[in-house]
Amino acid sequence: KKRETGAFERAMVLKMLKAYNPNSTFNHKKMVSLLQLNAYYEQLNRLNIRLEDIIEWFFDSYLKENFEIENFSISMPSKDSTFFEKCKSVLPEIDHILKEYKYYVEDGQVDPELVSISSEHMFFKDIPSKVKDKYVYLKNSDYNNLIDYYFFSDQCMLAYLENLDNKYDNFFKLIVKEDIKYNDFPEYDKKDLDWLIKEKLIFENDKGLLKIKNEERIMVYAELHYKEVISYWRKSEKIRNEIKQMIKENRLEIGSSLFSRNEQDYFNFYLNMSEFIDGYDIRNSNLHGTQIGDRKSDVHYSRYLQIVL
C-alpha cells in the first residue's frame, strides 16, 4: 500500500513507470507470509496431509456438499512431482478454475464442455463476482487528494501541535482523540482549517472545540486511506448510504469484480508481465521454459509456495 512507504523511502528510492515498485514493507510481509506458509506446508506433511489434496477436496467435494455447486474440478500435482513440475502443472489449473468460476457467475452453472473448449485467456480484472457492487474505491481527484492530505498525511502540519508534544502523525488521529480549538493552531495552519470548515468536513461545537462534522464520510475516507478498498456489503447501512451519496457526488466508484484492484495487481506482479515491467512473470517463465535456476533448484519450491499463496 502507498501509505506503507515512509517519507524517506518515497524521497530516496527511484520509482519506475509501469512498475509495481514493491517497498520495504511489502518485501517484509512477503518474507513473513512465505515463512508461515512453509511452516504450514511442512506441518501438513508431518501429519501425512497434502495441501494439494485439501485444495482438490475444496473444489471437488466441499462446494458440492455445502453449496450444491457442481462440476468445479481441479487437478493438483502428484505427490512424486518435483517442485519444478508442480509449478508447471498448477499454473494452468489456476486459469481452469477462473474459467469455471466465470461461467458459473455468467450462466449460473459450470459446463465442463464449454470450459474445455474455451481458449479465452483469463485476466484477473475481467473475472466477475457473484456479488454486485462488491468493492468501493476512491476516485483520483484534487478534492479527494486534499482530504487525504489534510486528514491522513504525516506531512500535513495540521497534525502537529506543540502543546501536545507532536504526538500524533496525522490530523485525523488528533481531532478524534484530543479536545482542540481553532486558536490552538498557528496562523499558517488556519487557512487549511478554514477550507475544511467551508467544505463541512469539520466544525466548531458549542464549546469551541473542533469536531468532525460528517463522521460517516470521514470514516469512509479513513478506510480508503488505510486499506485502499472497501468491501461494500460488509459495512453498516448508514455507511453504505454515505457511500451511495459519495458515488453520486463523483467522489467514489464501485466495482463488481471477483478480486479487488489491489489483489489484481498483486497477482499480475507475481504471475505475468501484463501490467508491470518489474513482475516475477512466474506463469510465462515456467510454461515457456525460461524460468531461473535448473530443474532441481530450490527456487522452484519458493515459487510454488508463492503460487499457492
Which residues does each PLM region occupy?
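Short, amphipathic alpha-helical interface elements at domain boundaries
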Residues: 28-181
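Amphipathic, oligomerization/interface secondary-structure segments
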Residues: 115, 119-123, 127-309
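Charge-enriched, short contiguous segments at helix-coil
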Residues: 2-75, 105, 265-309
